[in-house]
UniProtKB/Swiss-Prot annotation:
GO terms for biological process: base-excision repair. It is an enzyme of class 3 (hydrolase). Transmembrane segments: none annotated. Binds 3 Zn(2+) ions. It comes from Geotalea daltonii (strain DSM 22248 / JCM 15807 / FRC-32) (Geobacter daltonii). This is Probable endonuclease 4.
Length: 285
């Protein structure tokens, strides 16, 4: 059976290093940034480096690689410099992923910055309609990540994500990345079997389980509905181990990537520890 548990990996020294780092940590899948996250414009990845990445990925045996866009991008921003840079930045991400052979990009929907949720959501829809139409090179999925709802961030309700998907001229191009910390902080409780069942019934009714393409596995330093995004090691936070065990043993999610974004530790040892903890939760059938 293929393994779909993994973690976010650094691309320090070149993007081709990420697959090997993932294997060393014990990953079956990895997530990565395709560029420096503190810069609007990424360094051009040369054709030889693209080829090297693909060779290293093939050698690694990893089952999937997922990209995460840079945090500077805000597709809900008002017309102006930030919106222009966001559109250019996301288009560059789409093109890089096309060249790398990466078929899923995780992204935070954006912040309306006081202009209101309806306005912000409309801007996101318009941005994606433009990006998808103008970037035919990328044929993969865009995964809208659930958010904690800090400040004016959008995406903290399932309804927000549905609005973006259904409002788009290209609804088939979207999936969802369910971040356990973010959704818990936004008020979605999966800490007991009963609550877990209710949340997934709601997700299926509003968005559809077929849209779920990825998990970000993070416990939360803060409590339910706190609207604060603070990641903690698996089982060490306010969510607790039960929720992660429920997901790990849910046959509906067996083939969906589950990506750790928890603290790495002084020597990157914590990914291996958290991955083992998750795999040990799986009950033998």
């Amino acid at each position: 059976m293929k393994d779909y548990v993994g973690a976010h990996m650094s691309i320090a020294g070149g993007i081709h290093n990420a697959p090997e780092r993932g294997v060393k940590a014990g990953c079956g899948v990895i997530q990565l940034f395709t560029q420096n996250t503190n810069q609007w414009r990424g360094k051009l990845i040369s054709d030889p480096d693209i080829l090297l990445f693909k060779e290293k990925l093939a050698e690694s045996g990893l089952n999937e690689v997922i990209s995460h866009d840079i945090y500077l991008i805000n597709l809900a921003s008002a017309p102006g410099e930030i919106r222009d840079k966001s559109l250019n930045g996301f288009q560059e991400e789409m093109i890089r992923c096309s060249r790398l052979g990466i078929g899923k990009i995780v992204m935070h929907p954006g912040s309306h910055n006081g202009d209101g949720e309806e306005v912000g959501l409309r801007r996101i829809i318009e941005a994606f309609d433009y990006l998808i139409a103008e970037t035919p090179a990328y044929s993969g999925k865009i995964l809208l990540e659930t958010t904690a709802g800090q400040g004016t961030n959008l995406g903290y309700t399932f309804e927000h994500l549905r609005t973006i998907i259904e409002g788009s001229a290209h609804p088939d191009r979207f999936g969802v990345c369910y971040d356990t910390c973010h959704t818990f902080a936004a008020g979605y409780d999966i800490t007991s079997a009963a609550a877990y069942g209710q949340v997934w019934e709601e997700f299926d009714r509003i968005i559809g389980l077929d849209r779920l393409q990825c998990f970000h596995f993070n416990d939360s330093k803060k409590g339910l509905n706190c609207r604060i995004d603070r990641h903690e090691h698996i089982g060490k936070g306010a969510i607790g181990a039960t929720a992660f065990s429920l997901i790990m043993n849910d046959p509906r999610f067996a083939g969906i990537p589950k990506i750790l974004e928890t603290p790495k530790g002084d020597n990157n040892e914590m990914d291996e520890i958290n991955l083992k903890l998750l795999r040990d939760m799986v009950k033998q059938r």
